[in-house]
């Protein structure tokens, strides 16, 4: 009877070790859980970025004002018969 109880205890210890430290055990579960949280945050940021880009694309497709604004800001273009003034601050003051 004593040998039977000792065998059951050894079996329990073996299963517990496998549960905590084995492949796909509790520690692996915690690592994967943390990775899933991180990936969800990344996906949320990328989704927001995609929505912003999509809105900008729709604006460029549908509106002349967006194209004009982009040309003015990024390429410093001006309309015909328009004068462009650049004001530079004095570094000494």
Swiss-Prot record:
Topology feature Periplasmic, residues: 22-93
Topology versus the membrane: Single-pass type II membrane protein
Any one annotated GO CC term: cell septum
Chief localisation class: membrane
InterPro entries: Cell_div_FtsB (IPR023081), FtsL/DivIC (IPR007060)
PANTHER family: CELL DIVISION PROTEIN FTSB
Function per UniProt: Essential cell division protein. May link together the upstream cell division proteins, which are predominantly cytoplasmic, with the downstream cell division proteins, which are predominantly periplasmic.
Name listed for the protein in its UniProt record: Cell division protein FtsB
